[in-house]
Regions:
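Active-site and donor-binding regions of nucleotide-sugar-utilizing enzymes
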Residues: 1-63
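Donor nucleotide-activated moiety binding/catalytic core segment of transferases
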Residues: 1, 142-179
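Catalytic donor nucleotide-activated moiety binding site of glycosyltransferases and closely related
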Residues: 104, 126-156
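Short, polar loop motifs at secondary-structure junctions
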Residues: 13-16, 53-59, 138-146, 196-198
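Catalytic binding pocket for nucleotide-activated donors in carbohydrate/polymer assembly enzymes
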Residues: 185-230
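C-terminal amphipathic helix plus adjacent low-complexity
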Residues: 232-264
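A donor-sugar binding/catalytic signature common to diverse glycosyltransferases
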Residues: 9-20, 28-32, 164-202
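A nucleotide-sugar donor-handling region in carbohydrate enzymes
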Residues: 49-117
Length: 264
């Protein structure tokens, strides 16, 4: 794709793109959010500049000299108020009421990201959720659906607007950390059932929003607390979103300015 093209810069988060950019004398900028990743040092070495998309980095972490902390999380690029507008009409397909249902996500542990994680984390805590509470179930291994409570609503994915379903939920429980972070940035109380407790991005999402895990609060207490906040959730949600928007940089404006600098 780069052959015989006059490219001034590239933006990616991968080793191959950065390597190709170097070959074609193009300045590679990279975006990463996990300085624990095995590819982090390689990506940073190949970069002209590497943006570490974390609101803050723990003192125990030593970043690469080319790394610049960008005060945001990557999910904010598509969840910021200037970009994402929740659509309440998506709830009609499921006959659910705003802030009166839970969204749960069960990831497959067959991938490299979750290889060391216990399988069926959501299934193991399903009985703790009140039987009269509507639940939307996002399930990667859909062949296991019959093992979950039959009154739970199985989502037929991919969905056109999954983030609106998360936004209007009373809370989200996920065995994967990506969707737990998304919920937190949407101002939705979230609970992460996985094991990546020390990942900086998860710590940031917990600090600026509401993300708990098995080390910070029991799932029983979280369910009780979340259900007790249903009445006040819309107001609290907007306060959280506004607070995050003040703390995080505008990623789109930042990247636009970066690109225009190379056009001058």
């Amino acid at each position: 794709w780069a052959y015989k093209k006059n490219l001034a810069m590239s933006i990616s988060g991968s080793v191959p793109c950065s390597l190709v950019s170097r070959v074609f004398n193009c300045k590679p900028y990279t975006l990463i959010d996990d300085p624990q990743a095995v590819t982090y040092s390689t990506i940073a070495n190949l970069s002209y500049k590497s943006f570490c998309m974390l609101y803050k980095v723990p003192d125990t972490y030593k970043l690469h000299p080319k790394s610049i902390v960008l005060k945001s999380l990557k999910e904010w690029a598509y969840l910021a108020p200037s970009v994402f507008t929740p659509n309440i009409s998506v709830l009609a397909d499921y006959a659910i009421t705003p802030h009166r249902y839970l969204f749960v996500r069960e990831v497959s542990v067959g991938t490299s990201n979750y290889a060391s994680q216990t399988a069926d984390s959501i299934l193991q805590i399903a009985k703790l959720i009140p039987s009269d509470m509507p639940v939307l179930l996002s399930l990667e291994k859909k062949d296991k659906y019959k093992e979950y409570p039959q009154n739970w609503i199985l989502l037929q994915e991919p969905l056109q607007d999954v983030h609106s379903l998360i936004y209007y939920s009373a809370g989200l429980i996920s065995s994967g950390d990506s969707m737990a972070r998304e919920a937190s940035l949407l101002g939705v109380p979230s609970y992460y059932l996985g094991i990546r407790y020390s990942m900086p991005a998860n710590a940031v999402a917990a600090e600026v929003g509401s993300l708990d895990n098995q080390q910070t609060m029991s799932i029983e207490k979280w369910i009780e607390k979340t259900l007790s906040l249903q009445e006040n959730k819309p107001l609290l949600q907007e306060e959280v979103r506004a607070s995050i928007n003040e703390k995080f940089v505008d990623i789109h404006a930042y990247m636009y300015n970066l690109v225009t600098q190379h056009q001058q």
